[in-house]
Amino acid sequence: MTMKALVIASLALLSSCSVSAAETDLIKQGEYLARAGDCVACHTAKGGKPFAGGLPMETPIGVIYSTNITPDKTGLGDYSFEDFDKAVRHGVVKNGSTLYPAMPYPSYARVSDSDMQALYAYFMKGVEPVAQANKDSDIPWPLSMRWPLAAWRWMFAPTVEEHPAQVAADPVISRGAYLVEGLGHCGACHTPRALTMQEKALSAADGAAFLSGSAPLEGWIAKSLRGDHKDGLGSWSEEQLVQFLKTGRSDRSAVFGGMSDVVVHSMQYMSQDDLTAIARYLKSLPAVDPKDQPHQYDKQVADALWKGDDSKPGASVYIDNCAACHRTDGHGYTRVFPALAGNPVLQTADATSLINIVLNGGTLPATHTAPSTFTMPAFAWRLSDQEVADVVSFVRGSWGNKGAPVTASDVADLRKSDMRTTSGDDLGQVTQKH
């Protein structure tokens, strides 16, 4: 081989290695972004293979099933980048059908072109193909017809050009806005929806409805993430928020419901810089209630319980079933059993989540940085509807909390609801598995 040929061959080899390394980096970036978007949580059925779809999702008109997004021909195998982009950011699949808005493409419209390229590289070259056909929805005809979804998309979903990332004076807040309003699609759960099921706001610029809390879905409500002290994040520090997102627990609260999946599949893998950006952005959101005030601890109930006075409705149920972990003063045990005093979850206008936890229990998920799990047992088998209502009302109105009381009929409605039949033990197993 001549020297000239050797040089040419060496340059070609170096070029090949460079392309391969660049592609590997792009796939790795796409994997991180897929984590940020928590794609696996919706596109993986219980006991199924990652991203193969088939997870049932309750909607007001029936059950739909998530789709296969692996690079198999039954999934994304024949999707070009343009096809992929049209589905993710525009809500239109390869055959021209509009996706159900359970796919948060109105939020994904904010994802940048470069991040879309990385996501495509990951799903096409970094995900194991799984041959699994998509399942049809259980929505009855004529509600199952897709053409109304196209009209919905036209009326309510922003175009990519109309929905650019917000830019703030603080670049950390700008990054947080991009993650929360875009890939993180936090508003899909934490923003209320109109009768026509669109989110009432897609960004902070759209008004105070953004991230102000949702209506009940599958037995839970997604609480407000705005600056209110009573039922939002006003009393949380930036550091506490980062800790909560990374571990599922903090000095102030513990994760439950669908947010457990978010922590397990997504948030624990985010970089410290990105978690800080998310927390700082959320802390920048003002309160909804201009008269909102910080929680003022009231020790009257704690003193009464300490003296053995359980005359207040719900007090005896609390002493017998709750005080050992959450204490008579309502302060709980840091990062083990959450405090009830001043806890925003106890003071939301809708007590569905709290009733659900009492009935069905729950388990803190294990994460890389907080591997220990703690379980609250289910009390549905032990307490009557009236006893649950009494103890829920008791904790919502004690230690300075300002939550309204609930009734036995509120408990009965949730108990017999077919949306949440999982026992406390089953919930723990599901959470652990994911």
Residue spans for each PLM region:
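Bacterial N-terminal signal peptides that target proteins for export
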Residues: 1-7
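Bacterial N-terminal signal peptides
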Residues: 8-16
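Flexible coil segments in periplasmic/lumen-exposed cytochrome c-class electron-transfer proteins
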Residues: 23-26, 44-64, 94-101, 105-177, ...
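C-type cytochrome heme c attachment motif
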Residues: 32-44, 67, 83-90, 101, ...
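The feature marks the first
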Residues: 38-44, 55-110, 114-115, 219-249, ...
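C-terminal soluble interaction/assembly domains
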Residues: 347-348, 372
